[in-house]
C-alpha cells in the first residue's frame, strides 16, 4: 500500500490492534482514531486480559471496560504510545459514541477508566459533534482530546464544546450520513478550543431563528466525580403466632431441612423419621404460642425461648431463624431490631444509595439531603473506595447534555387554549361537511 505521494505506507500493519500491537516499541507526538462503536472485544479477550495483568508494563493496566464495548481500550492503546511528558508529551484525539462518557456505575471498569483519565489530568476537551455524520449510524458522537502536555491554563480543567449545531445538510445522503461539517465551521470549533473561554457563545439557528447560545463550558476535573454511598434504615418487625403466619413455617428452608437426608438405605429412613418427629415437635411448639402481636423482636424471642425450654425442645439456629422469619412482618411502628452488640440491623428492602459530589463531604450531604427526611437512617461506613479508603465508592461520569441544558418555559396557557379551541372548531366543521355529504 502506498500513500498519496507514492511512498510505501510502512506504518500500516495487519492484525487486531487490541491483541497484536504492531507498534509496541514506538511512541508518537499525535494520535487519532475512530474505533468501532459498541463493538465487543470477545475475540481479543484472552490477549487483552493477559496484558491487563501486567499492570503498568502493558497497555491495559488502568482497567478494562465491559466485554460488550471496546472503545476505551483503543484510547488506552493510544495513551500507551504517547511520549512521556518530560520528552514533550503527546496529544490524542479519538471519536467515540456517548457510551464511554457515562456507562458503568461507580467502581465499574468504565468508571475506573474515566477516573484514571481525569485524576491524572489527561482529558483536555470533549467536543460534541452533530448527529448523522457517519455512513453507518446517525447517533451522537464525541471527540475526546487527551493530552499529557496541557498548558498551565488548562491544568486541572476540562473544556466541553457543544458543536452539535455546526453542520449543513448534504445534497445527497450516504446511508445514515445526511450532514457534514463545512470547513469554516470546523475552523470555528478549533478556535473555540484554542480560545478556552468559559461561556463562549455562537449564533445558532434554532426553530428557524438565530439565537446566541453558549457552546463552551470549562469545569474542574473533580466536577465529574462522585462518591456512591449506601444509606441504611433500621429493620422494624412485628411477630405473631397467628394461623396464617404459622402456616408459612412449612415453606421455610430451615424447617424443611429437618426432614431431608443425604444418606441411603436404612440410615436415610432413620434420619427422615427423626426429622419428621422434630418437625412435629416444632409445629406443636409454634401452635402453642400466644397469638398476641409483639412489636419488639427481643420480647418475642424471650417468649419463644421460654416456651421451647418448658417443653424440653432444643432449637437449632436454622430452625429458630425459620420460626422467626415465618412469624414476622415488616412494621414501621415496630421497635428497631438490634444485633448482639446493640447496633440497629439494616433493612435490605429500605437500603438506598446516594451520589455525593466530590466537592462536598459525605457528612454534609447526608445531613442536608437525607437526615431531615429519614431521621433514623445512617451511612454504611463499611462500604469504602478500594483506592482511597474513604467512605463511598468513587465514580466518574460525564453527562454532557446536562451542562448545556437551557430551560425552555412552556407556552402561555392562553395560547394553548386558543389552539385547542381552533382545533375543536375545525373538527366540528369537518364533521359537518361529512354528515352533510352523507345526507346528500
Question: What kind of feature is each model-predicted range?
Answer:
Residues 1-26:
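S-adenosyl-L-methionine
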Residues 1-4, 80, 84, 436:
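Conserved helix-loop functional segments at active or binding sites
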Residues 19-21, 25-432:
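A conserved structural/catalytic subdomain of Rossmann-like adenosyl-cofactor enzymes
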Residues 422, 439-440:
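Charged, surface-exposed alpha-helical interface/stalk elements
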Residues 432, 436-439:
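Residue-level recognition of alpha-helical coiled-coils
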Amino acid at each position: 500500500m502506498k500513500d498519496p505521494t507514492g511512498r510505501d505506507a510502512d506504518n500500516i500493519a495487519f492484525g487486531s490492534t487490541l491483541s497484536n500491537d504492531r507498534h509496541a516499541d514506538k511512541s508518537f507526538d499525535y494520535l487519532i482514531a475512530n474505533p468501532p462503536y459498541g463493538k465487543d472485544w470477545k475475540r481479543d479477550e484472552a490477549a487483552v486480559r493477559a496484558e491487563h495483568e501486567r499492570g503498568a508494563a502493558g497497555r491495559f493496566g488502568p482497567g478494562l471496560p465491559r466485554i460488550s464495548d471496546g472503545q476505551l481500550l483503543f484510547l488506552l492503546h493510544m495513551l500507551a504510545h504517547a511520549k512521556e511528558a518530560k520528552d514533550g508529551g503527546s496529544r490524542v484525539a479519538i471519536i467515540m459514541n456517548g457510551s464511554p462518557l457515562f456507562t458503568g456505575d461507580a467502581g465499574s471498569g468504565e468508571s475506573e477508566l474515566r477516573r484514571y483519565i481525569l485524576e491524572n489530568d489527561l482529558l483536555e476537551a470533549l467536543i460534541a459533534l452533530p448527529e448523522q455524520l457517519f455512513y453507518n449510524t446517525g447517533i451522537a458522537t464525541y471527540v475526546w482530546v487527551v493530552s499529557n502536555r496541557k498548558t498551565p491554563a488548562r491544568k486541572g480543567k476540562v473544556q466541553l464544546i457543544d458543536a452539535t449545531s455546526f453542520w449543513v445538510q448534504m445534497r445527497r445522503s450516504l446511508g445514515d450520513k445526511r450532514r457534514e461539517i463545512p470547513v469554516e465551521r470546523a475552523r470555528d470549533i478549533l478556535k473555540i478550543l484554542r480560545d478556552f473561554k468559559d461561556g463562549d457563545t455562537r449564533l445558532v439557528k434554532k426553530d428557524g431563528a438565530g439565537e446566541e447560545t453558549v457552546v463552551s463550558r470549562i469545569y474542574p476535573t473533580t466536577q465529574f466525580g462522585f462518591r456512591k454511598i449506601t444509606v441504611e434504615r433500621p429493620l422494624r418487625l412485628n411477630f405473631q403466632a397467628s394461623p396464617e403466619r404459622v402456616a408459612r413455617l412449612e415453606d421455610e428452608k430451615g424447617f424443611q431441612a429437618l426432614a431431608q437426608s443425604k444418606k441411603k438405605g436404612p440410615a436415610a429412613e432413620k434420619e427422615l423419621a427423626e426429622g419428621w418427629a422434630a418437625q412435629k415437635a416444632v409445629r406443636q411448639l409454634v401452635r402453642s404460642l400466644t397469638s398476641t402481636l409483639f412489636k419488639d423482636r427481643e420480647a418475642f424471642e424471650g417468649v419463644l425461648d421460654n416456651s421451647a425450654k418448658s417443653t424440653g425442645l432444643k432449637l437449632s439456629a436454622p430452625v429458630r431463624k425459620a420460626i422467626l422469619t415465618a412469624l414476622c412482618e415488616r412494621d414501621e411502628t415496630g421497635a428497631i431490631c438490634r444485633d448482639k452488640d446493640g447496633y440497629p440491623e439494616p433493612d435490605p428492602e429500605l437500603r438506598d444509595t446516594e451520589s455525593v459530589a466530590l466537592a462536598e463531604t459525605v457528612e454534609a450531604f447526608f445531613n442536608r439531603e437525607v437526615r431531615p427526611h429519614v431521621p433514623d437512617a445512617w451511612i454504611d461506613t463499611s462500604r469504602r473506595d478500594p483506592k482511597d479508603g474513604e467512605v463511598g465508592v468513587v465514580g466518574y461520569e460525564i453527562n454532557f447534555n446536562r451542562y448545556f441544558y437551557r430551560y425552555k418555559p412552556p407556552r402561555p396557557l392562553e395560547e394553548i387554549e386558543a389552539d385547542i379551541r381552533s382545533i375543536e372548531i375545525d373538527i366540528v366543521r369537518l364533521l359537518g361537511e361529512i354528515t352533510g355529504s352523507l345526507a346528500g
